[in-house]
Amino acid sequence: MGGLSLLQLPRDKFRKSSFFVWVIILFQKAFSMPLGVVTNSTLEVTEIDQLVCKDHLASTDQLKSVGLNLEGSGVSTDIPSATKRWGFRSGVPPKVVSYEAGEWAENCYNLEIKKPDGSECLPPPPDGVRGFPRCRYVHKAQGTGPCPGDYAFHKDGAFFLYDRLASTVIYRGVNFAEGVIAFLILAKPKETFLQSPPIREAVNYTENTSSYYATSYLEYEIENFGAQHSTTLFKIDNNTFVRLDRPHTPQFLFQLNDTIHLHQQLSNTTGRLIWTLDANINADIGEWAFWENKKISPNNYVEKSCLSKLYRSTRQKTMMRHRRELQREESPTGPPGSIRTWFQRIPLGWFHCTYQKGKQHCRLRIRQKVEE
């Protein structure tokens, strides 16, 4: 009893203390005070709400939708590797979303695939859908395949980026790049951040000589497209091909093309001549990380926003170029059911969307900061 008496409070003080305890509990429930601190480099959504995005969204002009290419994450961009990331499904309607700005792609793709009966595998592009405007290399592939489904989707849940439109499906005969859509939150909206396109613009942006960004085309033939095992042939001319059986770079294919022409190894008959690659040949020549030395727009889109920490890459030495590793096996991912790292960087969890009068309204979810 003596021990208990030390813990007891006078009745009036007990009422005051319990009152303040309940006030603190209700206050925490109402304002969602963070009960922990960030002790490592891993940020949770609730922690980012408090520590990263503290600015209030004053206008929708502060939100900028940007297309981010997957090749910036180091995925293999050769045709045999890329086609393994795409697959056919039925019963899922395609979805299209617009975006305001994007990167210049090093690798784009253009597919025209037919079924064995001669019908088309891929749907034509809807009105208003044009090809991705900035491509260094366009991989044009023709061929046949079972195409077991209505549409070709991305197996990792990414988008196919077209000209300021991103779709979940591949359209026939249109240049596209693989990517995702992110939303940048600018502290203050600036008119110069995203310049509006001219009223009249060329259908093919790459024809604009002022861009200093020439586009090169590589042609392929694919057999059994959409199946687990497919064959990819690099086209030298109408009768000369090279079988591609491992990851490679666009620069390697151009060098291979020049070598075959130089040594006059073309087919001299009406039949097909198919070459195979020597196992000792290095197929990743010239593959410097394009995002470190490619030509960019004169106006660098650099803004300090509350999402800057999310898109900050690992620290690297300046004035250095690094080779991208192209191996048969991709880097290990998380446990089954996890999301790819490049997909986790999309801050979709910070926007709260509601439907009012048949229209969708989205706003940034900002937790109020408790004044000390």
Swiss-Prot record:
Species this protein is from: Sudan ebolavirus (strain Human/Uganda/Gulu/2000)
Annotated InterPro entries: GPC_FiloV, GPC_filovir-type_extra_dom
Disulphide bridges: 108-135, 121-147
N-terminal signal peptide: 1-32
Glycosylation sites: 40, 204, 208, 238, 257, 268
Region called Disordered, residue ranges: 320-340
GO cellular component: extracellular region; host cell membrane
Pfam families documented for this protein: Filo_glycop
Keywords: Cleavage on pair of basic residues, Disulfide bond, Glycoprotein, Ion channel, Ion transport, Secreted, Signal, Transport, Viral ion channel
GO terms of biological process kind: monoatomic ion transmembrane transport
Domain of life: Viruses
Name used for this protein in its record: Pre-small/secreted glycoprotein
Family classification: Belongs to the filoviruses glycoprotein family.
Record GO terms (molecular function): channel activity
UniProt entry tagged with the keyword Chloroplast: no
